[in-house]
Regions:
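Residue-level recognition of oxygen-bearing side chains
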Residues: 92, 208, 221
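Active-site-flanking alpha-helical
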Residues: 98, 188-189, 226
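GST-like fold's C-terminal all-alpha helical module
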Residues: 118-218
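Carbohydrate-binding/catalytic loop surfaces
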Residues: 139, 230-231
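Phosphate-coordinating loops and pocket residues in cytosolic domains that bind phosphorylated ligands
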Residues: 64, 218, 227
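Residue-level detector of family-conserved "landmark" positions at structurally sensitive sites
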Residues: 48, 226-227
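Short, solvent-exposed turn/loop segments enriched in Gly/Ser/Thr/Pro and often Arg
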Residues: 51, 180, 229
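GST-like domain detector, emphasizing the conserved glutathione-binding G-site
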Residues: 1-151, 174
């Protein structure tokens, strides 16, 4: 039995089975990336619900694993050289899980870098921009009278969606075959409906992206992972 006592987070969220991957998350777009990857890869894991309130993500126990106080985070009891490893940042988790299993990074070294390229695109562009769009359209930012922030993020969302739409021409998945890049991208696309922003970003004018998103959530693992741990 693995010993996870060196990880203080396990005091607040005890592991029932310390021999499997411990996931600390919530089914937000970033949280879904981790749970869907685990489901797609068929890895044994245990999901712990971490609320976004300060009592959870800013607790000493959670900060001991992720000092950036964001979900998701994981502990893998069977990390490099057989030693436990804790990780945060959803993109890093995706790359780690793919490399651990030798899956979802394409067939060739070039595929691997193309997949990582699109993960970085999501991490640096699509996720942050759509998150800000949601803030200024649905949440507290919607109360700001100055229209410029809202317009900026709507326009940037449109630009990024056009980049994706063009890049999907003639292919089902962003690097040609299903990969962690698709797992990184699609949960954020799905968030546009929650933000009530589909019309604002011209969703109906996109040629390839809507079918791409539908194809993604038609995968059984994606459907399972989209609500783990349950809200």
């Amino acid at each position: 039995m693995a010993d996870l006592s060196a990880f203080p987070i396990t005091r607040k969220w005890p592991a029932k089975d310390p021999s499997v991957i411990q996931l600390y998350s919530l089914p937000t777009p970033n949280g879904q990336k981790a749970s869907i990857a685990l489901e797609e890869l068929g890895l044994a894991y245990e999901a712990h619900r971490v609320g976004l309130d300060d009592a959870n993500v800013k607790s000493p126990e959670f900060l001991s694993l992720n000092p950036n106080n964001k979900i998701p985070a994981i502990i893998d009891p069977d990390g490099p050289d057989g030693q436990p490893i804790g990780l945060f940042e959803s993109g890093a988790i995706l790359i780690y899980l793919a490399e651990k299993t030798g899956r979802l990074l394409g067939e060739t070294p070039a595929d691997r870098y193309h997949a990582i390229q699109w993960v970085m695109w999501q991490m640096g562009g699509l996720g942050p921009m759509l998150g800000q769009l949601g803030f200024f359209v649905k949440f507290a930012g919607a109360e700001i009278e100055d229209p410029r922030p809202r317009e900026r993020y709507i326009n940037e969302a449109k630009r990024l969606l056009k980049v994706l739409d063009t890049s999907l021409e003639g292919r089902d998945w962003i690097i040609g075959e299903f990969s962690i890049a698709d797992i990184a991208i699609c949960p954020w696309l799905n968030g546009l409906a929650f933000y009530e922003a589909l019309d604002l970003v011209g969703w109906g004018d996109l040629k390839n992206v809507p079918a791409y998103l539908e194809r993604f959530y038609n995968r059984p693992a994606a459907e399972r992972g989209r609500n783990i741990p349950p809200m």
